Design a protein with these regions (language model features):
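Central hydrophobic cores of alpha-helical transmembrane segments in multi-pass inner-membrane proteins
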Residues: 2-18, 31-45, 81-93, 111-113, ...
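Membrane-interfacial loop-to-helix junctions in multi-pass inner-membrane proteins
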Residues: 23-34, 97-111, 125-128, 146-167, ...
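Transmembrane helix-loop-helix hairpins at membrane boundaries of multipass inner-membrane proteins
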Residues: 1-2, 16-106, 471-472
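C-terminal ends of transmembrane helices
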Residues: 13-25, 86-98, 139-153, 214-228, ...
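Predominantly late transmembrane helices and immediately cytosolic-facing juxtamembrane segments
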Residues: 217, 331-337, 400-434
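Structural signature of hydrophobic alpha-helical transmembrane segments
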Residues: 1-9, 71-82, 124-137, 199-212, ...
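Juxtamembrane/interfacial segments at transmembrane-helix boundaries in multi-pass membrane proteins
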Residues: 48-66, 166-220, 225, 254-268, ...
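Alpha-helical multi-pass transmembrane bundles of energy-transducing inner-membrane proteins
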Residues: 116-198, 283-347
Length: 476
């Protein structure tokens, strides 16, 4: 029942929130997200038996599809990321006002429902259903509550994701008709014996859909604009959690179903990913807008994760799984700071800011910790995952690894430059009357900083969660 609760708590709360007026909608959203977090923690620390982590019920028997959910190590990690992120997002942005707030929070909770379903589904049609459920509310969140260019940006986002979803649906149906008894069960997809040509065609149908969602070069062009124009709470969901849908799907669905195609296309995908890392890092160095800088930084991080997956070894895959969680937590922290600064000063431009450490020393200290995590310094949570990913890449190809390592230097440059421009030097007009951020923001940043330090010093619990998935993917 644990997987069912992880899905139905935000679903029921989201539907109910549509009818709640005033501050009650945000209070209900926060309360339901805390309840979901409690269930997620129980799944990891208390109800660890397989019987609590699996659920199977009839759904549409005439189509050969069932409502099958499963919690393995990777699912636990990503459902925990989703569960911990939403209360942090709701609490950190609690004082933000939204027109028709009940609709805003209802759509956010429906997005959480879809995300949970994606990470839990063990039936491919059910997976596709939740994939769309996670995406569709975001269209409305961006188009209704976004910035001045929200309509054009949302349309671009829609075109990209619709194309990806269509290709994935074609791939799902192709595999469905290849199964002996017309089944959507993941175990039946794993058991398929496809020819090299069938694997190659199906592989690309799925991979393009997942690459758009991550996104990696050259499928990334929707992302910076979407992050810039979306409400910051939505941007946190997009960059902290939703991009992990694509990475999760590559690990849990793509590589196990099409192992031969994954190996034969590995070099091409690794090269594209590393090109994307370097390209995004160089573009990030030129950004004056905090949101766009963080967006391009995220593209670089995701590029490394994709490259490490297709290094096709267990050490790289362990690093990716650890980094999915850590990147999600860290980037949400960066967005919280960006939103707090914009709320206080009215600007996101680095050239119009400075000296904030004198006005908001607590915020400065926390942001420096997050900046260190963004460049994966030792004793931060990002270090272990990044170290393992580069180890995996090194086993795959030394020269590609050397090129990828340049992105670390570039990340240090643009991240520390952002710290310097925001917090040090003399105060400017925008920051002269600025004070410390609200208590709610400080508390949520403190939670994130604790996670950064705890998993930086003691990452073993996260490493343990990766074992069963790594063994399943590589058949050990």
């Amino acid at each position: 029942m644990i997987p069912v609760l992880l899905i139905f708590i935000p679903l029921v709360a989201g539907l109910f929130t549509f009818f709640v007026k005033g501050n009650g909608s945000k209070q209900l959203a926060l309360a339901s997200s805390v309840a979901t977090l409690a269930i997620s923690l129980l799944s990891i620390f208390v109800y660890t038996s397989v019987k609590f982590g699996n659920f199977d019920a009839s759904w549409i028997p005439t189509l050969g599809t069932r409502f099958t959910l499963s919690l393995d190590g990777m699912s636990k990690m990503l459902t925990l990321l989703t569960a911990i992120s939403f209360p942090i997002i709701f609490a950190a942005t609690y004082k933000n006002e939204y027109k028709n707030a009940n609709q805003f929070y209802a759509l956010m909770l429906l997005t959480q429902t879809g995300l949970m379903g994606v990470f839990l589904a063990a039936d491919c049609l059910l997976f596709y259903f939740f994939w769309e459920l996670a995406i569709i509310p975001v269209y409305f969140l961006c188009s209704i509550w976004g910035g001045e260019k929200r309509i054009a940006v949302t349309f671009k986002f829609f075109v990209y994701t619709f194309l990806g979803s269509l290709l994935m649906l074609v791939g799902i149906l192709f595999l469905y008709f290849k199964t002996p008894h017309h089944s959507f069960a993941i175990k039946d997809f794993y058991a398929l014996k496809l020819t090299a040509q069938e694997q190659s065609l199906s592989f690309w149908l799925f991979f393009i859909a997942f690459a758009i969602k991550m996104p990696i070069f050259p499928f990334h062009t929707w992302q910076p604009d979407a992050y810039e124009q979306s409400p910051t709470a939505v941007t946190m969901v997009l960059s902290g959690i939703m991009v992990k849908m694509g990475i999760f799907a590559v690990i849990g669905w793509l590589v196990p179903i099409f192992p031969d195609a994954a190996h034969s296309n590995a070099m091409l995908i690794v090269v594209l990913s590393v090109i994307g890392m370097l390209y995004a890092s160089l573009i990030a160095m030129k950004q004056d807008d905090m949101k766009r800088l963080i967006a391009y930084s995220s593209i670089a991080h995701i590029g490394l994760m994709c490259a490490a997956i297709f290094s096709m070894n267990d050490i790289g895959l362990k690093g990716v799984m650890i980094q999915m969680f850590n990147h999600g937590i860290n980037v949400i922290g960066l967005w919280i700071v960006a939103d707090a600064i914009e709320q206080k000063t009215g600007t996101r431009k680095l050239s119009e800011l400075g000296g904030l450490a004198h006005k908001a020393p607590v915020l400065a200290i926390m942001f420096v910790v997050l900046a260190f995590a963004n460049i994966a310094l030792p004793l931060t949570n990002a270090f272990v995952g990044e170290f393992l990913m580069f180890n995996g890449l090194f086993e795959f190809n030394v020269y590609i690894t050397a090129a990828a390592l340049i992105s670390i230097i570039l990340a240090a440059v643009y991240t520390l430059t952002m710290v310097q421009k925001l917090f040090y030097g003399n105060t400017v007009t925008a920051t002269e009357k600025t004070g410390e951020v609200g208590t709610n923001v400080q508390l949520m940043l403190a939670v994130i900083v604790v996670v950064v330090i705890v998993f930086g010093v003691y990452p073993q619990p996260m490493i343990d969660l990766t074992k069963d998935t790594v063994n399943a993917v590589f058949g050990k």
